[in-house]
């Protein structure tokens, strides 16, 4: 009978209704994903233009696989490579690729702390992310031990940043706020340290012995051509 029909009859919900609903939802999700992709692609062009005006190179990767390919194109085989706690590099598969390939990857976890630090300064390539980047190409990084920001500033011959589009901010003020109120509290959780931001999720401008906000580095220009390369990834990666 019509009353027991699984089809759409007089507003009843049946198997075909649920299937059609799922299809509509899937379509909306795909449309939303495409709009996000287009927005990120357009925004990335602005960021890359800003980077170029600051004597830095920028690239846009549609996904993690494209980001990995771009990164490997920038790293000659045989290179000595160091890293500054870059979760984003791991997320795109770059660390595994380097360990499996013809590269000399400096694993600081297997070295004396001081020896690992000094080896990183003399590396051919230094991998990092940014805690935030402005739409006109200025990068913000916060560091506790300061090994990461010091290698970004000088030492390694080339620095490659892997940056998710989730880290792009309108201006320097919002980039600083993101670094302090998003990246720092998450990293405090990651390192399991005793800071107010770990407990509350926001910055208290603390002077805790465990604070990871010891050094702030704003990278607004590169004096050395071809040293700084930024790969913008159309994905939510890193902190």
Where does each model-flagged region fall?
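Conserved phosphate- and dinucleotide-binding cores of soluble alpha/beta proteins
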Residues: 121-239
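Cysteine-centered motifs
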Residues: 5-7, 21
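N-terminal active-site beta-alpha-beta segment that forms phosphate/nucleotide-binding
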Residues: 40-127
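Short, Lys/Arg-enriched N-terminal segments with co-localized hydrophobic residues
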Residues: 15-31
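Short N-terminal alpha-helical targeting/association segments
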Residues: 8-11, 17
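SAM-dependent methyltransferases
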Residues: 27-53, 59, 79, 118, ...
């Amino acid at each position: 009978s019509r009353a027991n029909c699984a089809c759409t009859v007089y507003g009843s919900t049946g198997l075909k209704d649920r299937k059609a609903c799922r299809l509509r939802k899937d379509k909306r999700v795909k449309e939303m994903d495409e709009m996000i992709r287009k927005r990120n692609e357009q925004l990335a062009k602005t960021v890359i233009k800003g980077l170029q005006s600051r004597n830095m190179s920028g690239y846009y990767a549609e996904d993690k696989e494209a980001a990995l390919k771009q990164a490997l194109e920038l790293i000659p085989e045989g290179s000595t490579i160091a890293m500054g706690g870059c979760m984003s590099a791991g997320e795109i598969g770059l660390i595994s690729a380097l360990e499996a390939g013809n590269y000399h990857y400096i694993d600081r976890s297997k070295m004396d702390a001081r020896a690992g630090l000094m080896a990183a300064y003399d590396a051919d390539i230094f991998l990092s992310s940014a805690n935030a980047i402005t739409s006109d190409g200025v990068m913000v990084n916060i560091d506790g031990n300061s090994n990461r920001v010091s290698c970004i500033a000088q030492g390694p011959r080339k620095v490659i940043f892997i940056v998710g589009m989730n880290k792009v901010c309108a201006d320097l003020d919002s980039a600083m706020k993101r670094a302090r109120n998003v990246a720092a509290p998450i990293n405090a959780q990651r390192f399991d340290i005793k800071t107010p931001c770990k407990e509350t999720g926001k910055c208290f401008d603390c002077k805790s012995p465990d604070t990871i906000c010891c050094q702030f580095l704003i990278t607004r220009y590169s004096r050395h051509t071809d040293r700084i390369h930024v790969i913008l990834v159309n994905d939510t990666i890193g902190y």
